[in-house]
Amino acid sequence: MIQYSSKFNNAKVLVLGDVMLDRYWFGATNRISPEAPVPVVKVQGIEERAGGAANVAMNIASLSVPVALHGLIGQDDAGRALDKLLNSHNIQNHCVALDSHPTITKLRILSRHQQLLRLDFEEGFHHVASDSLLAKLEQEITAYGALILSDYGKGTLESVQQMIQVARKAGVPTLIDPKGTDFERYRGATLLTPNMSEFEAVVGHCKDDDEIVEKGLKLIADFELTALLVTRSEKGMTLLRPNQAPFHLPTQAKEVYDVTGAGDTVISVLATAIADGRPYEEACYLANAAAGVVVGKLGTSTVTPTELENAIHHREETGFGILAEDELKRAVEQAKQRGEKIVMTNGCFDILHPGHVSYLENARKLGDRLIVAVNTDESVKRLKGESRPINDLNARMAVLAGLASVDWVVPFAEDTPQRLIGEILPNLLVKGGDYKPEEIAGSQEVWANGGEVKVLNFENGCSTTNVIKKIQASK
């Protein structure tokens, strides 16, 4: 079974940005105030959590990864509360405490798991000299595998361009969750992680995935970025890089409880994985899995290694996901014993596009379980040429396994999956395109076992070749 690991043995991350304290008041609400048409909350519990850049650092620390935090706080109770929180999680707290400004604090009042009100206590740190932060960064940057600049628009990162240049000179990747529409500030960064609304505020409305890719690649070129990760809420996330195919990941969130701090979790896991030397695709997969966990929690939260491990192998525990051939045989046998109808299809799935997604959804509707057999990299080269595949086998299978319509993904090394289909013997064999049923590899084996063979149509205009042509045309 192909696995991603939630252990980051070689990672070390530095976080610099807008530090905040999140306070939560929890209580019961049973009546409306006689003074005004507002609920009366009887406070029954108070909780304090790290927010902003401090929450980013907490996310990294929760993964058992060494992390240091640089930022600005006040010499006040909130600042001392933050210091205590950070120290309790073994975070190196290098925040500068100022007597001229209070610590940025956000107070949320909740009842029955619903947020009723948020109160912000802040003056921000605009026009506060950040020379000390810059000097500290220059001294320490080479000791880290990644730098996160956590920008909430509160002023700590007024020297962000100089900070980026310090990291570039040291050869350390810089990741930024951007704020506002002035992306010129982030020129030369390694990776930006805007959400969809932030992305469209800069590039304009995008009517479809193709336009997201086109405008995203232009943004990368305009601001000399290495990569761009657009987080798209219920549509997952999209990784873009020059001269490489877009990497789309569907959301893994089962239930969205609270999105507070989800962006912090994404960039934390991304940076940690990159600092650990993981490929960008794997880093995004892990970040996506972590985000799916954290939005199921209340308030500013973190993800533990165990939670991340369970999330990235969430189907493994029930026999689903990416399986080796012998594991798939056992899973299919058990499913057949339960009376489930097994549907099977195959392909290269080099660059997953809407046509693929629609096709797989339609195939899944024809039965209870869907198996997708995927050509290995060498098999794709023999079929498509030396320039293919664009995405390697692990990346292609990871994306397919993330689709709700797909139950099992299995690789095969031959030019056709005929042998594999003969071993699995699905109840229904499905293929997309203009084939005649008798031309489909494995059809004879399925028919001989009393099964069915069906041809489904792809959406018009959707093809991997067309996607590649659009990418080449955008260069």
UniProtKB/Swiss-Prot annotation:
Which reaction(s) does its UniProt entry say it catalyses?
D-glycero-beta-D-manno-heptose 7-phosphate + ATP = D-glycero-beta-D-manno-heptose 1,7-bisphosphate + ADP + H(+); D-glycero-beta-D-manno-heptose 1-phosphate + ATP + H(+) = ADP-D-glycero-beta-D-manno-heptose + diphosphate
Against CDD domains, the record matches this protein to: RfaE_like
| Region feature Cytidylyltransferase, mapped onto this chain | 344-475
- EC code: 2.7.1.167, 2.7.7.70
Q: Where is this region: Ribokinase?
A: 1-318
Q: Which GO terms describe its cellular component?
A: cytosol
Task: Recite the UniProt keywords alphabetically.
Answer: ATP-binding, Carbohydrate metabolism, Kinase, Lipopolysaccharide biosynthesis, Multifunctional enzyme, Nucleotide-binding, Nucleotidyltransferase, Transferase
The Gene Ontology biological process terms listed for this entry are: ADP-L-glycero-beta-D-manno-heptose biosynthetic process; lipopolysaccharide core region biosynthetic process
Q: What role does this protein play? A: Catalyzes the ADP transfer from ATP to D-glycero-beta-D-manno-heptose 1-phosphate, yielding ADP-D-glycero-beta-D-manno-heptose.
Return the protein name. Bifunctional protein HldE
Q: In which organism is this protein found?
A: Actinobacillus pleuropneumoniae
Encoding gene, per UniProt annotation: hldE
